[in-house]
């Protein structure tokens, strides 16, 4: 299920993005400040380049690049 980023409260969206950008394996040795990484993800969401995907079975959200989202979720 796709969740519109603007359906989330600002603080909730920020926490979701921060969780995503601070996960192991997401920095790839990049020393970019947290605020910059959060801003980049927020911009990707507003441009439609990234989407929030909710899995009802696991009850978890994840951020994905649009081209990585399973096609059936767009139906």
UniProtKB/Swiss-Prot annotation:
SUPFAM superfamilies per UniProt: YehU-like
One Pfam family hit: UPF0270
Transmembrane segments: none
InterPro entries: UPF0270, YehU-like_sf
Homology family: Belongs to the UPF0270 family.
NCBIfam families hit by this protein: PRK00304.1 (NF001441)
Protein name: UPF0270 protein PFLU_4323
Protein species of origin: Pseudomonas fluorescens (strain SBW25)
Lineage of producing organism: Bacteria, Pseudomonadati, Pseudomonadota, Gammaproteobacteria, Pseudomonadales
């Amino acid at each position: 299920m796709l969740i519109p980023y603007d359906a989330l409260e600002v603080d909730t969206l920020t926490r979701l993005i921060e969780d995503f950008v601070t996960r192991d394996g997401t920095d790839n040795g990049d020393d970019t400040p947290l605020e910059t990484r959060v801003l980049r993800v927020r911009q990707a969401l507003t441009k439609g380049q990234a989407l929030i995907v909710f899995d009802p079975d696991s009850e978890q959200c994840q951020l994905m690049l649009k081209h990585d989202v399973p096609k059936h979720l767009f139906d």
